[in-house]
């Protein structure tokens, strides 16, 4: 390990984990963390259940980023002999107009053809992003269009509702997912905004929907655990080193529940980059995959300040799950491995970076 890499990791440990000078690996009150070299990152496991994921992908103008990332996903799966049992689409599925709604030609050209069933035969689970609400209902209500397309029975695109629960894989499940709508009404109608819009003027969920979802979330988290892992996915990150920053509403409403019920993983997009954040004493690993095709954003906080990983880059991510551990990887638009970590059911984290 180079000295510069060592300094970066020590800074990260001081910031996020109260670094102990007594050992090269941090031993923490609720989370054990170790580092390994990226070159020796956990190899592909033939017995793992596999998921590939992207966020912020359905751009309405320049499709070069989306096309490159989709091609890298297909090539990566072929090279490693993967047949992912699911894809995750972490919101901002459609930017701009979706003319024709559920019958729009964009479904074929930007979803079915770029992520073909021949390469990705599993279901494609999706959550709603702010751009999915954007412009609705001025032209086409994209939220309703996505729900309608998912319920048509003609596609792998899966969205049973604005929020929903599923287990993965379908046979002998290893992980329970709670998929949420993170488009929050932030002081509805305040600051001269139109009622029912966020700070950017985008349509959002109603206060009643927000309350209903929050009650549903806690009820689901209270249920007896039947899988080794519990994860939540939504579009907006709770914490982010990108320009959107930390989300005060989600920190207030969701983060206490994640801590209380021991949610092990939170998946998000929204900031157009790839991130992985860990915090001292927090049971949740925060994993952001927003490099699916939309224009990239500059980071606001560098990974040396808060990490362990943040990179302004197009790319996709992989989640591999076994009984012993779940492994998450960030890869760029060439399929190059940028960052990886594994986490056991007890919460021990091994970071390769």
Where are these regions (language model features)?
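N-terminal secretory signal peptides and thylakoid transit peptides that target proteins
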Residues: 2-23
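C-terminal segment of classical bacterial N-terminal signal peptides
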Residues: 26-31
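Extended active-site neighborhood of metal-dependent phosphoesterases/phosphodiesterases
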Residues: 74, 95-228, 245, 249-265, ...
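Short acidic, glycine-rich surface-loop motifs adjacent to enzyme active sites
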Residues: 225-241
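A short C-terminal boundary segment appended to hydrolase-like catalytic domains
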Residues: 309-353
């Amino acid at each position: 390990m180079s000295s510069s890499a060592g300094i970066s990791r020590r800074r990260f440990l001081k910031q996020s984990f109260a670094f102990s000078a007594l050992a090269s690996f941090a031993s923490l009150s609720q989370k054990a963390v170790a580092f390994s070299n990226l070159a020796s990152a956990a190899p592909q496991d033939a017995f793992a259940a596999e998921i590939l994921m992207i966020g912020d992908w359905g751009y309405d103008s320049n499709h070069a980023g989306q096309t490159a990332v989709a091609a890298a996903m297909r090539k990566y799966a072929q090279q490693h002999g993967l047949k992912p049992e699911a894809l995750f689409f972490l919101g901002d599925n459609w930017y701009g107009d979706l003319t024709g709604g559920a019958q729009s030609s964009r479904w074929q050209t930007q979803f079915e053809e770029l992520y073909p069933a021949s390469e990705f035969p599993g279901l494609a689970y999706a959550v709603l992003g702010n751009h999915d609400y954007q412009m609705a209902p001025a032209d086409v209500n994209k939220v309703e269009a996505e729900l309608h397309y998912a319920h048509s029975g003609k596609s792998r695109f899966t969205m049973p509702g604005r929020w929903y629960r599923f287990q993965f894989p379908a046979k002998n499940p290893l992980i329970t997912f709670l998929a949420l709508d993170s488009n929050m009404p932030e002081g509805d109608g305040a600051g001269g905004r139109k009622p029912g819009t966020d700070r950017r003027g985008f349509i959002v969920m109603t206060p009643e929907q927000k309350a209903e979802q929050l009650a549903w979330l806690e009820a689901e988290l209270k249920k007896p655990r039947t899988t080794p892992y519990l994860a939540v996915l939504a579009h907006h990150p709770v914490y982010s080193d990108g320009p959107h920053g930390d989300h005060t509403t989600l920190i207030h409403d969701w983060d206490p529940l994640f801590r209380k019920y021991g949610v092990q993983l939170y998946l998000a997009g929204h900031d157009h980059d790839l991130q992985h954040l860990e915090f001292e004493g927090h049971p949740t690993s925060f994993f952001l995959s927003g490099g699916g095709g939309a224009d990239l954003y500059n980071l606001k906080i560098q990974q040396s300040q808060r990490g362990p990983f943040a990179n302004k880059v197009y790319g996709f991510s992989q989640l591999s799950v076994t009984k012993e551990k779940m492994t998450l990887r960030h890869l760029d638009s060439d399929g190059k491995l940028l960052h990886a970590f594994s986490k056991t059911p007890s919460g021990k984290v091994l970071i390769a970076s």
